[in-house]
Amino acid sequence: LLFGLGYRLGGWVSSDKRKSPVYYACSLLAGTLKGYLEQNRFDAVVTPHLYPAETLTAMKKKGWLKIPVVAIGTDYTCIPFWEETDCDCYIVPQKDLLGELIHKGLPKKQLFPLGIPVKQAFSTQKKRSLARKLCRLPSDAHVYLVMSGSMGYGDCAETVQHITNAGVDFQILA
């Protein structure tokens, strides 16, 4: 409920014309991060979250950051405030999201729909029967993957309740 309200308020405040309270809060960390980046002399910064992207944007605006910033989006929607960031490129989870990001004000030439980087082990194909055996799943049961991030998805318990009410034989893994 709280995160949903935050998203709605963020969508109302969010604009590529003005900065949000989120930007100003994140910019308070710019001085500390500046020292760390100068001390370690990185070639680029890669960030998988909006908050450090906001901090890095504040640093760029002050002339404190001269190295490229790469933002990796891990949401399948344009969350509020990405449009007020100034990253050199944005890795987008999927190409279907490009229109939404462009509409919100992110520059098309800086958007790269390359997916969310994951550990190589997740890309390894396994036979379904072997995967079920490794996970101790019955070979004939329906399998539903219900997962959520830290905010925005909604009520996972309600989704599972709908599956339960559908009268389908399934097993819950927790």
Label the model's feature ranges.
Residues 36-43, 137-139:
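Glycine-rich phosphate-binding loop signature in dinucleotide/nucleotide-binding domains
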Residues 37, 80-90:
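A conserved, positively charged/aromatic
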Residues 43-44, 89, 143, 171:
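Structural motif
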Residues 44-49, 53, 57-75:
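Active-site proximal beta-strand in glycosyltransferases
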Residues 65-68, 107-109, 168-170:
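A short helix->loop->beta-strand "cap" motif at the edges of active sites that frequently abuts
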Residues 88-150:
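A nucleotide-sugar donor-handling region in carbohydrate enzymes
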Residues 134-174:
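Conserved catalytic-core segment of nucleotide-activated headgroup transferases in glycan assembly
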